[in-house]
Regions:
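N-terminal intrinsically disordered, cationic/polar leader segments
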Residues: 36-46, 51-90, 97-98, 140-171
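Solvent-exposed interaction patches of small proteins and small membrane subunits
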Residues: 81-84, 107-108, 130-132
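Conserved interaction-surface patches within small, structured recognition/assembly domains
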Residues: 94-110, 121-124
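Glycine-rich phosphate/pyrophosphate-binding loops
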Residues: 126-143
Length: 173
């Protein structure tokens, strides 16, 4: 990748961002379709994408842009039934499907949290319930996200993952 060889500059940032954003748009377009890779492969792809960025300012901007690419979320789903408690911002998570293939829709009123949702959906949505239950979110540590989230965002992310896995466990019961 020619862009990665450039010294840290605005051109480098734009080039890296455009390369990654193209990947993100394609992957987010797949969020509402059958997943073509395993959860482990999705985590690896996320790690590779985040490796392109030089600093956390770029990574946060990427998260914000991922959140903007989430599919529209119907207002009628923004109910207490679907709300994820434990998040400082408002987050809603709607499960569908069965143990063979679970699909999740989610949204937040926070731009960065919506980006986190996009990553979580990429790893966990459109997968068998057993794979969801068995998959640990290794990408969080791999990309250094745990060190760069506030405690309230970390708690919210943990609450979202717990609720998602609880839905999968319920589908298996």
């Amino acid at each position: 990748m020619l862009c990665r060889k450039w010294k840290k500059s605005i051109a480098h940032t734009v080039c890296s961002y455009n390369n990654i954003f193209g990947i993100a748009v394609r992957d987010n377009a797949r969020m509402n379709t059958i997943a073509t890779t395993s959860a482990a492969q999705a985590q690896q792809e996320i790690a590779e994408e985040f490796a392109f960025f030089g600093d956390w300012t770029e990574r946060y901007q990427y998260l914000i842009d991922l959140g903007k690419q989430l599919p529209s979320f119907p207002e009628q789903w923004k109910t207490e039934e679907y709300r994820v408690h434990g998040c400082q911002s408002m987050v809603w998570l709607v499960p569908s499907g069965d143990a063979l293939s679970m699909h999740f829709e989610a949204i937040s009123d926070s731009a960065i949290v919506s980006g986190l949702i996009a990553l979580v959906l990429r790893v966990y949505s459109d997968r068998p319930a057993q794979e969801i239950v068995d998959t640990e979110p290794q990408f969080i540590a791999t990309i250094g996200l745990a060190k760069h989230l506030s405690p309230t965002r970390s708690n919210g992310l943990a609450a979202m993952l717990a609720k998602l896995k609880a839905h999968a466990a319920q589908a298996l019961a």
